[in-house]
Amino acid sequence: MFQAVPGGLDVQLVFYRGLHECSASRWVSDGRALAGLMEKIDCRSGPTQIGRVLRHTRIENAKGKVSALVFVGDAMEEKPEDLYVAARDLGVQAFLFQEGDDPDVTQTFREIAQLTKGPHCRFDPGAAYQLRDLLRAVAEYATGGLKALSASRNPGAVKLLQQLK
């Protein structure tokens, strides 16, 4: 992501785990700092907390311009209607990247993306290169809009452009 747009991207990592934990990092502007934050996270079983992530994004956007929300997930255990309400009030395009092919998750993620005028893209489990390409494309879009995405040779940009135009 950071290599796609050197010096032009700030990222905040928001994650949830366990029964009630949903945390946000400080904003970082380089890949090493983000990797360091990600290395400290461990997985714990618990329900999804997508609604909390959406609400956090809305609050951060009210503090200052958030260009995009990138959500990567493989499950959804909340009431879709509650997520749709949160998505309508988001004020930020949501880029939803789904690992796997659960039809309920697909339907909900697709609707959230549509409500926020963002894309929903599936990628194959274990296909880190697909996710890498999608994240690079989001970085290009967040810093340069459709013009930058259209000029990109990144395979992820093609996937996003199909839904953003």
Predicted regions and their residues:
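Von Willebrand factor
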Residues: M1-R26, R32-V72, M76-K79, G100-R110
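A general structural motif
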Residues: G8, G64-V66, G91
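Hydrophobic/aromatic beta-strand patches that form the interior of the parallel beta-sheet core
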Residues: Q12-V14, V70, F95-Q98, P119-C121
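Acidic, Ser/Thr-rich peripheral helices and adjacent loops at domain boundaries
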Residues: S29-K40, A113-P125
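A cross-taxonomic marker for long C-terminal extensions/tails that follow the last structured domain
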Residues: L69, G73-E77, E81-D82, G144-R153
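VWA/integrin I-like adhesion module and closely mimicked acidic/polar interface patches used
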Residues: A75-L115, F123
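C-terminal "exit" segments of structured domains
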Residues: H120-K165
